Amino acid sequence: FAYAHKLYRELDVPIGILYILAFSSLAVYGVVLGGWASNNKYAFLGGLRASAQMVSYEVALGLSLITVLMLSGNVTLTEIIWQQQQLGMWYAFPLSLAFLLFVISAFAETNRLPFDMPEAESELVTGYHTEYSAMKFSAFMISEFGHMVTASALMATLFLGGWDIPFWTGDN
């Protein structure tokens, strides 16, 4: 933990949260194009269903982030962590409803249980990656797991203090 804040400041973008939201919304195009490019009507329907779910929960995710932006007064990720450090507690406690909304929206946007309707085996076989195997299928899976890691890192940064633990007095 000793050098995490130095590395994070080097990688920080001045428009932090807006940058992350913009790139997470670009994933919708990949899902639709992946379903369409397979030339299968069920994969295309699965891609449309997945993109509709991603777009609809992106709104709830953005609304939960607005509360963090209003409380911190900044869009830079390091400044949000610093504000939590100055407050002496994580934003997950005063913004517990927004934290819960963010967690539910993150599960829905990454197509995890119970929001895995784009991959409903009984209706659409396996969703938008029905016709893919080997390297193309693994590319879809890597992108989905990357989306989960990004959502988890964003949750830890915005609501759980990032690298800082306010009640721990170790070498920080």
Functional labels for PLM-detected ranges:
Residues 1-172:
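Selective transmembrane helix interface/packing segments
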